[in-house]
Amino acid sequence: MKVGITASKSDDFSEWYTQVVLKAELADYAPVKGLIVLRPDGYSIWESIRTSLDVKLAARGVRNGFLPVLIPESLLGKEKEHFAGFNPEVFWVTHSGENKVGDRLALRPTSETLAYSLYSKWIKSWRDLPLRINFWNTALRAEIKSTKPFLRTSEFLWQEGHTVHACSEEAESEVAAILELYRETVEGDLAIPVITGRKSEKEKFVGAVYTTTMESMMPDGRALQMGTSHFLGQNFSRPFEVKFADKDNVEHFAWQTSWGLSWRLIGAMIMVHGDDKGLVLPPKVAPLQVVIIPISYSGEEGAQVLAAAEGMEAELLKAGIRARTDKREELTPGFKFHDWEMRGVPVRIEIGPRDLKDGSAVLATRHDGKKSKVPLDGAAVNIEEELCRVQTEMLGAAKRALDGMIHDASSYGALTKAVEGGGFVRAAWCGGLECEEKVKEETGADIRVVPEGGAEGACIVCGGRAASIPLFARGY
Amino acid sequence: MKVGITASKSDDFSEWYTQVVLKAELADYAPVKGLIVLRPDGYSIWESIRTSLDVKLAARGVRNGFLPVLIPESLLGKEKEHFAGFNPEVFWVTHSGENKVGDRLALRPTSETLAYSLYSKWIKSWRDLPLRINFWNTALRAEIKSTKPFLRTSEFLWQEGHTVHACSEEAESEVAAILELYRETVEGDLAIPVITGRKSEKEKFVGAVYTTTMESMMPDGRALQMGTSHFLGQNFSRPFEVKFADKDNVEHFAWQTSWGLSWRLIGAMIMVHGDDKGLVLPPKVAPLQVVIIPISYSGEEGAQVLAAAEGMEAELLKAGIRARTDKREELTPGFKFHDWEMRGVPVRIEIGPRDLKDGSAVLATRHDGKKSKVPLDGAAVNIEEELCRVQTEMLGAAKRALDGMIHDASSYGALTKAVEGGGFVRAAWCGGLECEEKVKEETGADIRVVPEGGAEGACIVCGGRAASIPLFARGY
Ligand SMILES: [Zn+2]
Ligand SMILES: [Zn+2]
């Protein structure tokens, strides 16, 4: 395997993606088809997402819990529509040691059924509501298509939140608040802009009343679902008997929500920001934010350079910046530049003898390749600002790219043509399943998201009265 | 179910334990036998342990990663002795959807085999060493005996660390350093004293050269293993071909360690510190450290009391203390006292109209039931000190209890009698398997830990020359 990225993002997007994942050491394939492992840099990005979301969830009163991975078949099958949706991709445990287990055990494809069978025991009265619990775990859904790290794997890291409310209004406002909090995380930390709205009836979560979603567009013109928040109404509280007694001691079925996002966000981040040199990491989630490279090693001069590099590293660490000096003497500065560029480190500092003389260092930013001088004195403040600028500029650039990939179509012909070119296509729709299915069949595009607001004019498929203006696209 | 704990710790330890776990809402039973779920207070304690350990591990250069839960049977079977040890309790996946999977898939009982099959790809030269990765996940081992939350479950939360080194000395010193770091976590955060040393050959981890362990003693006289750190030597690097090229480009098999601790620490914490009123939590891991209870609600007076309570809550939160005011008007202060005592909150603050008048509040500590006055002004500093005192005293009390449960036996008769009475029994041993097995068969006691240092005199079983003075006990 050659060291650097040998595929071009524009020429062979899929091969480029795989090379970046493997060579930047974010992930690797596990021995079982469909499964991947995360190496420390990959997992560190997930930890950053987790920490950021945890803070926001805690502020809303959401607490974390733990659910086991095994769900008995009888329980998973309790909500029929839900079960039918997941059944084909469920992994089944049939034996423990030499013994056959009675009821087959499913590896959780999602935990609604398990969580709600417990909630029905835990919730007795209005005092117990709202109940808001989140679970950081994995979900398992057998993938028969070829493995794609972060995007198509049979086990994936995610969080699933499950809340219970006394009235539908509170539950619906929870659904919206969580989606907004997801958006803040994805735009704020991963620098990926998203479009929010609802899924169509056809595309909603099996068992939900409706699903809200945030969608983004990848550089290859295919849409990616970035997270969903579902209003479950009483669809689960009835079969699972999640009931509460109100202040007058009258029993009611509760109103519920569930919501989740997964490590596919990492896949999106790679695709949206990466380039032919490899990964480009937004500073907020970069495992290493600043790499310091001493340019000289020999003699007195080398010692001074190394001392300056280590001094800066200490200063940056003290300021809470994730920084490291690359002291590998056997490698050239040029090799190191390429290596850290491939790994997406947002800021590189070069310190050589000449820099030392005028008390400065060279600062290079990964996302735009620009170089500037930074004074050695008080470097932390400057570099902190620089990291902030990088984060902002990366989101800005991604926003411009997204905007450039949203097209309008006022006829079925225009829609077909636009879908072919990739990106989102905005077109009026009557809301009918037939029209949605015709588009899917003939163009391969789904309705990815129906933004808020009504529509005027006619459905571009059937000519009927338009009800909304969804975004169509081929998706991952 | 009655609200409070109805079983006595001294009369029916097992029933008491289960009631505390369920009524303090740490955990609950899942629908599948052998499995439990963690409710937010239970999971929060695990999160505290995780955070504390993560900081210490990061300081040693250990980073976190992710491994999938499915391991192919052929890979799990690669180290024969290891496989034979785990095989009887492995859950097997045989189907995904309607399709039979080829090679049966094991739910990870532990991840040595999976991790090392990857390490063999990742490690090429001395530059890649040492490699230190830790995984926070669950392990699955089918339990046929009755479920006991945190102590005997078929899936449990744990961490498993796997390191690789160029020489055996470095690996062995890693084994020791990790055990020390475990001890700091358990003694420092959970206030549980431990005894460290090695496991006997019979009790070591299957596949290890040797296992080091920390053991503690529960109030019912049974020992509990609190965490283990294994020196694997080259036992796994040979079958898994974990090799590295040294500076002269000569290939060597690497030296490895693995180590883990699990949520049974939470079980130990409940048993060691709890009392007939319920849970007693060490402040460092308590989800809620201080509960503030307003004593009056009515009229002008009530408003003043509530304002004072909320003022203190804000001050404590600002100081980083986990505090909350219990504003439930429909419940009496007495009910609340009992409720929070059952949940183990370390410090309770009571604020009533009379307290307000002299600018103070009543502070009650859970672990010793003592009450004192605390000035409302600058309460955070006082309460922070109080939490520190509680933490220290709880460890001190637990240390005294442990010391009181270590007995010496200088004859086989004395050993048998001492084992019967519960606790650790220290007795000279020749090191022979036969003597160890005789003790186990006739008394039910295992060798829990062999502390460092040699021994004089004779083995109390066979009269042969003593090699060490292990601690015998019946265990969990
Ligand atoms: Zn139509
Ligand atoms: Zn002997």
Swiss-Prot record, chains A, B:
Swiss-Prot/TrEMBL catalytic activity: tRNA(Pro) + L-proline + ATP = L-prolyl-tRNA(Pro) + AMP + diphosphate
Top-level lineage group: Archaea
Cross-referenced InterPro entries: aa-tRNA-synt_IIb, aa-tRNA-synth_II, aa-tRNA-synth_II/BPL/LPL, Anticodon-bd, Anticodon-bd_dom_sf, Pro-tRNA-ligase_IIa, Pro-tRNA-ligase_IIa_arc-type, Pro-tRNA_ligase_II_C
Cited Pfam families: HGTP_anticodon (PF03129), ProRS-C_1 (PF09180), tRNA-synt_2b (PF00587)
Physiological role: Catalyzes the attachment of proline to tRNA(Pro) in a two-step reaction: proline is first activated by ATP to form Pro-AMP and then transferred to the acceptor end of tRNA(Pro).
Record remark: domains: Consists of three domains: the N-terminal catalytic domain, the anticodon-binding domain and the C-terminal extension.
Protein name according to UniProt: Proline--tRNA ligase
Organism: Cenarchaeum symbiosum (strain A)
